[in-house]
Amino acid sequence: MITLTPGRLTLPQLRRIARENVQIALDPASFAAIDRGAQAVADIAAKGEPAYGINTGFGRLASTHIPHDQLELLQKNLVLSHAVGVGEPMARPVVRLLMALKLSSLGRGHSGIRRVVMDALVTLFNADVLPLIPVKGSVGASGDLAPLAHMSAVLLGIGDVFIRGERASAAEGLRVAGLAPLTLEAKEGLALLNGTQASTALALDNLFAIEDLYRTALVSGALSVDAAAGSVKPFDARIHELRGHRGQIDAAAAYRSLLDGSAINVSHRDCDKVQDPYSLRCQPQVMGACLDQIRHAAGVLLIEANAVSDNPLIFPDTGEVLSGGNFHAEPVAFAADNLAIAAAEIGALAERRIALLIDATLSGLPPFLVKDGGVNSGFMIAHVTAAALASENKTLAHPASVDSLPTSANQEDHVSMATFAARKLTDIAENVANILAIELLAAAQGVDLRAPHATSPALQHAMKTIRADVAHYDLDHYFAPDIAVVARRVRERAFATLSPLSFESEQ
């Protein structure tokens, strides 16, 4: 059980919500603030004075006053008219994050929503009755309206859900969870719909995947150093301390740790080679820059996870209703775009190391890492696959946040495209997982070919993990299953956990 303290969520909590089947509870310390916010909205509605989102229309229709007897209908119509998402359903971890983030935002007491509505979301979450939310349809301002509308419609008994992974109607989902359809009161529909929780959930889910891939790439990159008989001198701490970037310093330390005790390295210490290619030698510089970006993005997303991104905001102490723009997801868009660049670079550098390993001139290994080349093609086309994926990622890494299209009759005339920025990270991460799987196979092949010299004790664990599923490549065979099984192990963090470097979300 994870207790959600609104405004004080942690990255480890969020990773567990995404990756484990933990249940959640709202911190009782938040109840008083929630109740004050709900009462403030009720008081404003009773007075009948115009207040955006409470008794007015929305967007370009904000100047339209809504009579008191139509306020509940206004909120219902808002939810139903905004549930216009298209595409495949959001993944289960993303929906779980989305619901937890929405509860945190609402729980700070500035949205004016009753506890009964929040309790219903908690009950659905813990019953594993998750709204079916189409992944496409948000521009990241005014919040993630369409995705959150699909979440909210379920509270009304409308739409679809997944009950323990099986698709069903929202009405059936409520029945299984022991709930009745809700009637939303003044502002509650808007409070549920307005916010950056969809884009932030997508970005967080992919952040955790990219953190795992980063750790895996440290292992695969170190293994490639030994496979290519590369030098460990470029990882000397003194080099990186002179430059001063924290990520570079930490990455170099990880490579030193992973390669410590390598007999392969000792075997060629006095060779004639002066410098290795950049894909080996500059790993701390490139991976360090990636590490800095990942850490920065994590910090931004944690702030957003704890933010109140509703509009308007209720300030119960003064009774004020303030309209602003916290729903604009530009910080999330920038963070996701930076993650895309970092993840694409992780894959691009790994692809270059694969190219180095299969090149006999550069690596000193048999061409394409196979004996009897000619009749056997070895890793020739596995590298082509890695190149295809790395190239695809370069296009996917184009920033989504540099685009904007006006909506709502030009009332909402600049948007963030944060949801797309976060969504395309899924494809980038999947491509990187496959590139790293190919590198791990190629590097393991190269290390085998360095026998009788052995790699380091740390990297021998990686070798054992690979060889538990895939044998040494002696002769050409149907290769795709080898890549698939190692990619699955990459996703399962089998290699990430071998890295000495870890992230805040894993603490």
From Swiss-Prot:
Principal location class: cytoplasm
User: Residue positions of the PTM 2,3-didehydroalanine (Ser)?
Assistant: S142
Involved pathway(s):
Amino-acid degradation; L-histidine degradation into L-glutamate; N-formimidoyl-L-glutamate from L-histidine: step 1/3
Location(s) in or outside the cell: Cytoplasm
How does the record describe the protein's post-translational processing?
A: Contains an active site 4-methylidene-imidazol-5-one (MIO), which is formed autocatalytically by cyclization and dehydration of residues Ala-Ser-Gly.
One GO location term (cellular component): cytoplasm
Provide the GO biological process annotations.
L-histidine catabolic process to glutamate and formamide; L-histidine catabolic process to glutamate and formate
**CDD domains for the chain:** PAL-HAL
Q: Which GO terms describe its molecular function?
A: histidine ammonia-lyase activity
UniProt keywords, alphabetically: Cytoplasm, Histidine metabolism, Lyase
User: Any transmembrane segments, and where?
Assistant: none
Source organism superkingdom = Bacteria
Q: Where is this cross-link: 5-imidazolinone (Ala-Gly)?
A: A141-G143
Any Pfam family? Lyase_aromatic
What reaction is this protein's catalytic activity? L-histidine = trans-urocanate + NH4(+)
EC numbers: 4.3.1.3
Leader sequence residues: none
- Could you say which protein family the record assigns here? Belongs to the PAL/histidase family.
What PANTHER family does the record point to? Answer: HISTIDINE AMMONIA-LYASE
Family matches, as NCBIfam families: hutH, PRK09367.1
- What this protein is called in its record is Histidine ammonia-lyase
Gene coding for it = hutH
